[in-house]
Every structure is written in structure tokens, then in C-alpha cells.
UniProtKB/Swiss-Prot annotation:
This is ATP synthase subunit a. InterPro entries: ATP_syn_F0_a_bact/chloroplast, ATP_synth_F0_asu, ATP_synth_F0_asu_AS, F0_ATP_A_sf. GO terms for molecular function: proton-transporting ATP synthase activity, rotational mechanism. The lineage of its organism: Bacteria, Bacillati, Bacillota, Bacilli, Bacillales. F-type ATPases have 2 components, CF(1) - the catalytic core - and CF(0) - the membrane proton channel. CF(1) has five subunits: alpha(3), beta(3), gamma(1), delta(1), epsilon(1). CF(0) has three main subunits: a(1), b(2) and c(9-12). The alpha and beta chains form an alternating ring which encloses part of the gamma chain. CF(1) is attached to CF(0) by a central stalk formed by the gamma and epsilon chains, while a peripheral stalk is formed by the delta and b chains. CDD domains: ATP-synt_Fo_a_6 (cd00310). GO terms for biological process: proton motive force-driven plasma membrane ATP synthesis. It comes from Listeria welshimeri serovar 6b (strain ATCC 35897 / DSM 20650 / CCUG 15529 / CIP 8149 / NCTC 11857 / SLCC 5334 / V8). One of its GO terms (cellular component) is plasma membrane.
Amino acid sequence: MGEEFPTISLLGIDFNLSNILMITVTCVIVLLIAIICTRNLQRRPTGKQNFIEWIMDFVRGIINSNMDWKTGGRFHVLGITLLMFIFVANMLGLPFQIAINDEVWWRSPTADPIVTLTLAIMVLGLTHYYGIKMRGFKHYFVGTYFSPMKFLFPLKLVEEFANTLTLGLRLYGNIFAGEVLLTIIATQLAHMNIFVGVLAIIPALLWQGFSIFIGAIQAYIFTMLTMVYMSHKVSDEH
């Protein structure tokens, strides 16, 4: 789309200030949600406590569908954090996009492949870390890359690379495409007369609602695949 972003150079490395801002905003929102929803907890949950407990149970279900709770319980907080972080990040760029001096400052951080691929690398790195920690290096390496047959080793390496790419690029592609279409619709509305523009708002709102659905689905898929990959690394039966 030919967008430009504010950058700052530090030690010869360029940092995207828009990404830094939006990731920080996402973290603050998720933290506030967690704090607000866990204050004044009661035995009989209502309202906000119901919401956070529903998220906890939802992630628990994702984990239980991939590994036993004794093994997967330690990843419960990771799953909750990923689900909430990615969902909030996906939503930030939907209502509007802010550009100052032709530089985009406000948009979904997950609409940048650098952010999503970094997140994917971090997640896959954690699966290797816990695999080695829980199974031992030798057992982990042999069980992961030489099972069930040794000649599959090259394919297993390709699979690791492909998993990282698909995990990151799937999230990026869906969120970026949604923002592009919303931008196109908004641009077209700006050039229409008032009567046609009012009618055109309807499909714009429908697409915005669909984008919210896609953002939620992508947060779920990313969290689900994280637990799938984690189960493959930490469970002996895989």
C-alpha cells in the first residue's frame, strides 16, 4: 500500500516506532483487562469475573484437547496471554488508522509480518526449550527428529521451518488483508456523494463485523497451534 512508518535508528538498527507503540498499547490493554476482571473475586462469579473465567476455561479446553493437564497445565497462563494479546492486537487497527505527516502511527501490530514472525519464532523457541527441559536433550532430539524413522530427519527440519513461517504469515495475511479492504472502502466512501455514501456504510459495517470475527478466529488458531506444537515437543507419545 506504499505506507511509511516512523523509525528510529539505534546502534545501526532501525526500529519501527509504530510497532513499538502499538505493542505497548496492546500490552497495557491486556494488563488492564486482567487487573479489572480479577479484582474483588467472589465464589459466585458475575460479570467481569465470568468473562475472565470463561477465557481461562476456554484455554484449558484447548490444552486438554492436545495433552494431559498434568503436562499442559504449566502452559495455561501462556495460552491465556497469547489469546488475549493477539485478539486485542488484531482489533486495534479496525476502527481507524492514524497517520501523522504521512507516517502511520496507529494500526494493528499484527498487520506487520515482522511482528507476527517474531511472535511465531518466540513460540516455537519455547516449544524447543520446554521439550529439552522436560524430556532431556537426547530423548527430546531423538524422539522429535528421528522418530519414527531416521531418514525423516531432513523432512523434520523442513517442517520446523514451515511451521514457523505458516504460523506467523497466516496471522499477518488475514489481519493485513482486512485492514487493506477497510482502507479501500473508507477511501471510496470519501469520494461518494452523501446519499450513496450513507448506503455504502452498510457493507463497510458488515465487513468490519466480519473482520472482528476473523481477528478472534486468528487469535484462537494461533493459540491452538501453539499448544499443538508444544504437545509434540513435550509429550512422549508424540
